[in-house]
A protein has these predicted regions:
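Active-site cores that bind ATP or allylic diphosphates and position pyrophosphate for catalysis
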Residues: 104, 108-262, 269, 281, ...
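Charged substrate- and nucleic-acid-binding regions of tRNA-handling and nucleotidyl-transfer enzymes
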Residues: 438-499
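Residue-level signal for inorganic ion chemistry
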Residues: 25, 56, 96, 100, ...
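Conserved phosphate-binding loops in nucleotide/dinucleotide-binding enzymes
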Residues: 79-83, 106, 192-193, 211-222, ...
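Glycine- and acidic
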Residues: 5-10, 38-42, 211-216, 277-282, ...
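N-terminal Rossmann-like or analogous alpha/beta NTP/dinucleotide-binding catalytic cores
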Residues: 1-124, 224-235, 294
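Structural motif
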Residues: 285-293, 329-335, 369-378, 450-458, ...
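Small-residue-rich helix-loop
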Residues: 352-452
């Protein structure tokens, strides 16, 4: 059975790259009828940020990425916070020491800094590995008695992995194919820290094994760690999961990985939900009015393509189509305009009733009381030009309040010498129209235009100016029907008194 995990660290807001990693894990699990786990990797207590864990959970919930096991959904592999699994890791570190795959290292920070400086003076780069480990203070260079004495008196130590010397390691990645590396170029990574906590590397491998993870799908930034992780599985005598390293999400312009600073600089969110740090709230996609399904659709196509020209996919369709082998190796450029396009598409797909409920909240905040049926009709007329629900007010405020000014360029272009006469005659036509609906109103005005031999441009633009204040908006007669006879006539009289 397929089992995958999303394993973020609670060191701040969940970045959009992390969201995509969670999404691809979720899609892969559901495609294969498997389980999607959430594990919180909080081994680095110095970087722990209060509230970050709950933020991660809230973000996944908002996006509809429901996990089968994890924090708050305890399964048989609980607990799912690494800080709560602390006693577990020491025994596995000891196992590696006992079977010769790891060793105690007692080097102080000062001693390591001195070794680095000496290497740099020779023009070399210091690496703690097969070439240098026997010259440093560790259980490989010290006698057994010296090591026991140091451990007994409580000397600070870390546990390092004993990287094999001069081995050409061949690994398989589901996205990148075969990856080869010479272990001589790798360092002896710390697996267990002096504070009694494991590093990411040890905890990650132990937990993935114990939780029976079958596929590790993570960001490209973890590709350099793959050799160590493969070798750790070998050292423990365990079957390694399949690995897949996702391409980076790149800046909209320029080189490099998308960062929080890019969002701030260019004015778009990079977090799923609003996040407050140092007293400053950074807007997320949720807070900016994006629909979760629009963000999901957008992220799914960042680095993956189903092999056709379609772009709009429901979650069920994404699950059905998703294939890790179709994920690209190259980085995917983040396009803030494209996600707006997706949001526009999903806004059009929503019912007028659903959008009206959201819009009515804004109207209530403005102390505007309108029947829900009327709000629905207004939404149906304006949503085609909207990207966000927040756009509705600017697109529709003339339904709720008369224009306070008129577009000067439009007035100059459309308000002719005979326009006041035409407007007065239209007022009379509207006053005499008994059936005050869009169809009847349009027919009455068209009959008037034919009788007077007037063109569209002589009548409709001035009429729109009077009602809206500018030459934009929905069908004029739909506007007239919704604002009503009394308000329509008032606005026509107002523009006559305003423009002399």
């Amino acid at each position: 059975m397929v089992r995958v995990r999303f394993a973020p660290s609670p060191t701040g807001a969940l970045h959009i790259g992390g969201v995509r990693t969670a999404l691809f894990n979720y899609l892969f699990a559901k495609k294969h009828g498997g389980d999607f786990l959430l594990r919180i990797e909080d081994t680095d207590q110095n970087r722990y940020v209060e509230g970050a864990e709950q933020y991660i959970i809230n973000s996944l919930n908002w996006l509809g990425l429901t996990y089968d096991e994890g924090v708050g959904k305890e399964g048989k592999y609980a607990p799912y916070r690494q800080s709560e699994r602390k006693p577990l890791y020491k025994q596995y570190a000891d196992t590696l020491i006992n079977n010769g795959w790891a060793y105690y290292a007692f080097d102080t920070a000062e001693a390591l800094e001195k070794a680095r400086q000496e290497c740099e003076e020779k023009g070399d780069t210091f690496i703690y590995n097969w070439a240098t480990r026997n010259t440093l203070e560790n259980s490989l260079s010290l006698t057994f008695e010296e090591v026991q004495q140091r451990l007994t008196r409580g000397d600070a130590y870390v546990v390092r992995f004993k990287m094999p010397e001069k081995e050409i390691l061949k690994m398989s990645d589901m996205i990148r194919g075969e990856v080869t590396i010479d272990t001589s170029t790798l360092d002896d990574k710390v697996l267990f820290k002096s504070d009694g906590m494991p590093t990411y590397h040890l905890a990650n491998i132990v937990d993935d094994h114990l939780m029976e993870i079958t596929h590790v799908i993570r960001g490209e930034e973890w590709l350099p760690s793959m050799p160590l992780h493969i070798l750790l599985y070998r050292a423990f005598g365990w079957q390694a999961p399949a690995f897949a390293h996702l391409p980076l999400i790149l800046k909209p312009v320029g080189n490099g990985k998308l960062s929080k600073r890019d969002g701030i600089k260019l004015g778009f969110p990079v977090f799923p939900m609003d996040w407050t740090e140092n007293g400053e709230t950074l807007k997320g996609f949720s807070g900016e009015g994006y629909f979760p399904e629009a963000l999901i659709n957008f992220l799914a196509l960042l680095g993956w393509n189903p092999g056709n020209d379609e772009e709009i996919f429901s979650m069920d369709e994404l699950i059905q189509l998703f294939d890790l082998e179709k994920v690209h190796k190259a980085g995917a450029r983040f396009d803030p305009e494209k996600i707006k396009w997706f949001n526009h598409q999903y806004l059009q797909k929503k019912s007028d009733a659903e959008l009206a409920v959201a819009f009515q909240k804004e109207l209530i905040a403005k102390d505007i009381e309108v029947a829900s049926t009327k709000v629905e009709k207004i939404v149906s007329l304006i949503k085609e030009r909207a990207t966000f629900v927040a756009d509705f007010w600017e697109l529709s405020k003339f339904f709720f309040e008369a224009p306070k000014k008129y577009d000067e360029k439009a007035v100059k272009k459309q308000w002719k010498e005979n326009t006041p006469t035409i407007v007065r005659e239209v007022i009379e036509v509207l006053q005499n129209t008994l059936d005050f609906n869009s169809v009847a109103l349009e027919e009455a005005v068209k009959n008037y235009m034919e009788t007077k031999q007037l063109g569209f441009g002589q009548v409709m633009p001035p009429l729109r100016l009077a009602l809206v204040g500018e030459l934009k908006g929905p069908h004029v007669f739909d506007i007239i029907e919704l604002i009503g006879k009394e308000e329509t006539l008032r606005r026509l009289e107002t523009i006559l008194s305003f423009i002399k």
